[in-house]
Amino acid sequence: EGPGHEFLKSVMPHMLDDEAGRADLDSAARIIEERTMKTRQFFNEIADDWDEMNREILGEFSLPEVILKAVPEDCRVAADLGCGTGEVLEHLRGACRELIGVDGSPRMLELARRRFDEHMDGISLRIGELDHLPLRDGEADFICINLVLHHLSRPSAALGEIARVLNPGGRVLITDFDQHLQENMRTSYGDRWLGFSLDDMRSAMERAGLS
């Protein structure tokens, strides 16, 4: 992420040719995997309280209603990445023919299935990480990712995957926190990033091909 992005791209081939460089890359990969596992464990543990935690953060603001207004009229397939317990998917029913919810937490997806009970027609819940999405290229006409990027070790990887699975001409809606200094969010809510500036987000989206 950030200014070092292009530098890393330029030195990566040389690191792969060097034994010490390969060891550094392997170490970095292990760190990312450990962080992914910790994030998954965190969300499994707080899944039953997640909806209430969201209400604590957002208050009376209805994020699902805002997302619903952004769905294109001709939407066939909508995907909610980091869908949690399925609250946004519930609001999107009727707006698209098919809904896809992706989450890395098995417990979150279990609660999402309970939300819809036996009424799963047109809804596909998929386990997966956002840097390796379980969607085909160009599968979704509309993608939303809500208050999720700040939990990820590599937000840029998720943006690249969004670009891959978004249908050409499709629409993506990203909601997240502005940059802030509330360090307690790391321990209370598992945040890895303290929000993002609008300029940084725009630059990251452009690099991912989402401009």
What are the residue ranges of the model-derived segments?
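N-terminal auxiliary segments of SAM/dcSAM-dependent transferases
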Residues: 1-41
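A short SAM/SAH-binding and catalytic strip from SAM-dependent methyltransferases
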Residues: 141-154
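Class I SAM-dependent methyltransferase SAM/SAH-binding core
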Residues: 79, 85-132
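C-terminal alpha-helical "lid/dimerization" subdomain adjacent to the S-adenosyl-L-methionine
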Residues: 171-211
